[in-house]
Amino acid sequence: MAKKIQGYIRLQLPAGAANPAPPVGPALGAQGVNIMAFCKDFNARTKDQNGMILPVVITVYTDKSFTFILKSPPASVLLKKAANIATGSGKPNQDRVGKVTKKQCAEIWKLKKADMNAKDEAAGIKTIAGTARQMGIEVVD
């Protein structure tokens, strides 16, 4: 018999650096989940991706057990890393803060394609390029 689901928790956490401090502690504590068990499991599974922000979906069951699914890093984080910038532009249509190539957009799409709803590679690359433009990053050939 399958376990009954109590709820879902969605968080974005730095890989290998989950700790009981907010936002993890309050979100998991409200559902009655063992916070330290989650932190240890998460840090063990993400130690090779250190420094990246990873979305995680935690499924909490009525017996207070949990499972979690790791997603690929947000496109904005990958684009900032590719363009070697700390933040996007405050005025993306006026100020350009960095450059990425279409080849870099294709590499980001390959990392993100499991989590994206683009029909094919060309549409996925256009989506990533659109995200870059909205951040003030110029897309060059």
Curated annotation (Swiss-Prot):
Function: Forms part of the ribosomal stalk which helps the ribosome interact with GTP-bound translation factors.
Record's protein name: Large ribosomal subunit protein uL11
HAMAP family found in the cross-reference section: Ribosomal_uL11
Sample GO molecular function, one term: large ribosomal subunit rRNA binding
Gene name tied to this protein: rplK
SUPFAM superfamilies per the UniProt record, alphabetical: Ribosomal L11/L12e N-terminal domain, Ribosomal protein L11, C-terminal domain
PROSITE patterns linked to this entry: RIBOSOMAL_L11 (PS00359)
Subunit structure of this chain's protein: Part of the ribosomal stalk of the 50S ribosomal subunit. Interacts with L10 and the large rRNA to form the base of the stalk. L10 forms an elongated spine to which L12 dimers bind in a sequential fashion forming a multimeric L10(L12)X complex.
One GO location term (cellular component): cytosolic large ribosomal subunit
InterPro entries according to UniProt: Ribosomal_uL11, Ribosomal_uL11_bac-typ, Ribosomal_uL11_C, Ribosomal_uL11_C_sf, Ribosomal_uL11_CS, Ribosomal_uL11_N, Ribosomal_uL11_N_sf
Mod. after translation: One or more lysine residues are methylated.
Family: Belongs to the universal ribosomal protein uL11 family.
Record keywords: Methylation, Ribonucleoprotein, Ribosomal protein, RNA-binding, rRNA-binding
Gene Ontology annotations of biological process type: translation
SMART domains reported in the protein's UniProt record: RL11
